[in-house]
C-alpha cells in the first residue's frame, strides 16, 4: 500500500550484464529519462507470456544489444518506484550475468538508439542509474576468466 492507502501497482523486468573479458555491453534506449536526457543502461524488459526471468533476460539482451550470451549467474535485483498515470509503481528488475558468445551490437532493435561495448570499470561509473552500476560491479567480481 502507498502512504495514501491505495494499492501500489507492481512491475517486473529481467535484464542482462553481458561481459567479454574486461568489456560489458551497454545500451542507449530511444526512450529518454523523465527529465529528457538520454540514458546509458543495461538491456532489460518484461517477460513475454510464460517466459522465465532468465529466458526474458536472454531475449532482451539479444533484441536490445544484438548479442547472445551464456548464463553464468543471477546478480540480484534492483528495486525502485516510478510514477505512471498518477500512480506509484513499485518496480523490480532481476539481472543476470552472461558471458558473450556471439552477435554484433550493431544488430540491436528499433527501441535502442545505440548499443556498444564499454570497459566494465567505466560502465560501473557511467551508467545512468545507481542500481545498474551496482549490477556491473557485482558482475566484475563474478565474471569468469576468458576461455
Describe the function of each predicted region.
Residues 62, 66-103:
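Active-site segment of metal-dependent pyrophosphate-handling enzymes
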Residues 102, 106-137:
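NUDIX/MutT-family hydrolases
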Residues 2-42:
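N-terminal strand-loop-strand
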Residues 19-24, 32-34, 48-49, 77-80, ...:
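Short, charged/polar surface micro-motifs in flexible loops or helix N-caps
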Residues 17, 26, 95-97, 117:
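Conserved hydrophobic/aromatic beta-strand scaffold that supports enzyme active sites
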Residues 41, 90, 117:
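Short aromatic/basic micro-patch
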